[in-house]
From Swiss-Prot:
Membership in a protein family: Belongs to the OXA1/ALB3/YidC family. Type 1 subfamily.
A GO cellular component annotation in the UniProt record: plasma membrane
Biased composition (Low complexity): 41-70
Organism this protein belongs to: Sinorhizobium medicae (strain WSM419)
Transmembrane regions: 8-28, 372-392, 446-466, 491-511, 535-555
Compartment list: Cell inner membrane
Protein name: Membrane protein insertase YidC
Main location per the UniProt record: membrane
Keyword vocabulary terms for this entry: Cell inner membrane, Cell membrane, Chaperone, Membrane, Protein transport, Transmembrane, Transmembrane helix, Transport
Gene Ontology MF terms in the entry: membrane insertase activity
Amino acid sequence: MMENNRNYFVAIALSVLILIAWQFFYVSPKMEKDRIAAEKAQQAQSQPGTQQAAPGQAAPGQALPGGAIPSAAESRDQAIGKSARVAIDTPALSGSINLTGARFDDLKLKGYRETVDPKSPVITLFSPAETADGYFTEIGYIGSDATGSVPGPQTVWMLSGGDKLTPSTPVTLSYTNDKGITFTRTISVDDRYMFEVVDSIKNDAAAAVSLSSYGRVTRFNKPSTPSIYVLHEGFVGVAGEHGLQEVGYSDVEDEEPVEPGKSTGGWLGITDKYWAATIVPPQDTPFDIRFSHFADGRPRYQSDYKSDAVTVAPGQSAEVKNLIFAGAKEVPVVDNYELTYSIPNFDKLIDWGWFYFITKPMFKMMDFFFRLFGNFGIAILITTIVVKLIFFPLANKQYASMANMKKVQPKMEELKKKFGDDRMGLQQAMMQLYKEEKINPLAGCWPILIQIPVFFALYKVIYVTIEMRHAPFFGWIQDLSAPDPTTIINLFGLLPFEGPAFLHLGIWPIVMGVTMFLQMRMNPTPPDPTQAMLFTWMPVVFTFMLASFPAGLVIYWAWNNTLSILQQGIIMKRQGVKVELFDNLKSLFSKKPKPAE
């Protein structure tokens, strides 16, 4: 027994060392690397000077017309105030369109704030290029000598219709070049996050002209929050037959641009955890998508497309329609846009992960219960009950097998006495006993293994869906997508200091650890010392692991463990087997070391 106790302490020591090593060798260096990269980007942005390419012509190293690349020397208000603009005002958005380039570079999300504090600033999505957080989208054209000057980054559009963009009042912009080609742009917006940009091109020149449309989403910085491998942030799109494209920022920083190939149908953009900016090009014209990074002047990331040329005969007109999505990745809204505008796989804008076939239905289930009860925490609890009911037949079979194992416990003890130190003989005899009694020795692990896909699916739902952002539960849990804010290190706020982040253990992670420990003690202790040690210390390791996970996930895990304990107890009683939870606990804490010989 003293040897077993020593093994227990070795196991817990190793577990803590692993957590410390993970923090020291991986998390801390990664955060430092991100910090240094952000500082370098900030320094590069603050360098004075601009680079200029001619309107309608490709800048060096670019396939699209370039514009001025200004230094990040102005405040947001200064940058917005120096240019002519048309206001945007919808139930979900506020901002303006810059008439120079018809650029969407001023956009805020009315319904979302930076923190749970209702007085905190609303989320800013787009900002002008002259600011440190420059982020914008624009639509333009690539022409030739025959077309003359075509709309590009430096084109000054004239506001020819409407004075404010609202869901009920579109605006019209116009531009006529020296060749007699008139571009009339009508911009409309719905009550959420979708803009329609429809260009009418009238050719009053003497000859036919050919020109290609382009669109780009440009960002002068990466998100300041550390990236998480379970979630994709960066370039995203669907390139026709080439399918879903997910390209990280680092994938293009030191490499060539990523170009999936010519496509018909699809979309492209840049996505964050909760927000996105995308362009849906004309779906009936082939186009090329590109994801790239430019280090000239100020480093910037760009997701763009260029369509095949469209020819407009003399005296004729052509129409080019683009869609721009800019806003929150709300699941019902994104799904509705996919259906309404026939955008292929637009729901993939939300990173549902490998278990898409589980994750999205689970969200829909939780969303249904949320609308019914008005609390996502309660929705998680009820969804867990539904999942338990779905898996009940299989769980019933597994728990019944475990109950049968308890019945043969006396026979197992006899085999231990019979074979003594003959471990090989004992294992063979045990396997024969399992076969005769039709027992699966791994039945105790199966309930945990079964829920792993569901666990990851729920983790995805809680982590990536904006509906969980700032969603309260009860008491101190005001954001189910964030970790439990309490910590045992300072006695849950009673002491005026904070311990190391990797040692933070909130109330809910501790509750989860206790329920997991009790669930493990519902099962017979494995005869193998290594397995027994694993069963003993697994709850401790999981408690530390889940301490930094979203509170909603930890609540789910604790509640699921509680339901599993009740389910297993009921099944064992039905099988006529004594529930030995309290006996196992009493035995665990009353064991005494053997006296030294």
